[in-house]
Amino acid sequence: MDLLTLWNLEREEVLKIIENAEYFKKNRYGHDILKNKSIALIFESPSTRTRMSFDLAVHELGGHSLMMNEGEIHLGKKESIADTARVMSRFVDAIVARVKSHKTLEDLAEYGSVPVINALCDLAHPCQILADLLTMKENGKNFKGLKLAYFGDGNNVSNSLMIAGAILGMDVVIATPRSYEPSGLFVKKALEIIAKYGEGSLTLTDDPEIAAKDADVLYTDVWISMSDKNKNLDEILKIFPKFQINAELLSKAKEDAIVLHCLPANRGLEITDEVIDGKQSKVFDQAENRLHAQKAVLKYIFEH
């Protein structure tokens, strides 16, 4: 089974992955789920947390990881992605790919014969969000009816948060400047999932105070993400500051609200030092939880 986006998962499956991630966090070592299995790790862009967490996850589950960075692999350059997928499937048991285009993942999954995991692309970041869900749960947050507020650029993280929130019955509010909204496709999918379960809601707004009011979780990411290199920096610095998570914005949320950021953070831009280093910040727990969530994802794909 592939994991390209979260919308292919049912609620029970997401909850099971989180449950397994909790187990792996409490029982880090002594597993052989990936014994005699080799996992290819493809990285088209630099990575700290994703690379470390997947590499360690494979090893700590008893498997072998094969790291391939951009420039070390023919991925649509000098060889079609289809042929690369076919060849890699003869050598490895699964492919974990952090790529620039979602289409690359779709091609790897279509033409390869082994599971493909989206470790990040321009449209989605499902593994990150599974770690986020673990962080919410271990901080006593019940998913159903939880108000999750996202601030900043409508990027791959916001796309996947909408889907996760819809699956689990959250009330998700995405606060972005106009013309920086999340993907229309992901909005449509989220609304379909909300209708399917009859729970939760999705609101898009350009007013960060509306989003922050009585929120249980406040979430932000960098203002210029991997898909936004052509966006005007002067424009970003002019229209985004009101979406910064700072003490004033945080004060509008619930007293026990937590703050998340998938990192790396541009301190002083999308989030202040005071907040990211404050008692309500769970950012570094969130980063650690990438490891435990990746293990749960690997376990899941080899069981389905």
From Swiss-Prot:
Transmembrane segments: none
SUPFAM superfamilies: Aspartate/ornithine carbamoyltransferase (SSF53671)
Catalyses which reaction(s): carbamoyl phosphate + L-ornithine = L-citrulline + phosphate + H(+)
Location in or out of the cell: Cytoplasm
Family, as annotated: Belongs to the aspartate/ornithine carbamoyltransferase superfamily. OTCase family.
Protein's job: Reversibly catalyzes the transfer of the carbamoyl group from carbamoyl phosphate (CP) to the N(epsilon) atom of ornithine (ORN) to produce L-citrulline.
Name of this chain's protein: Ornithine carbamoyltransferase
Gene: argF
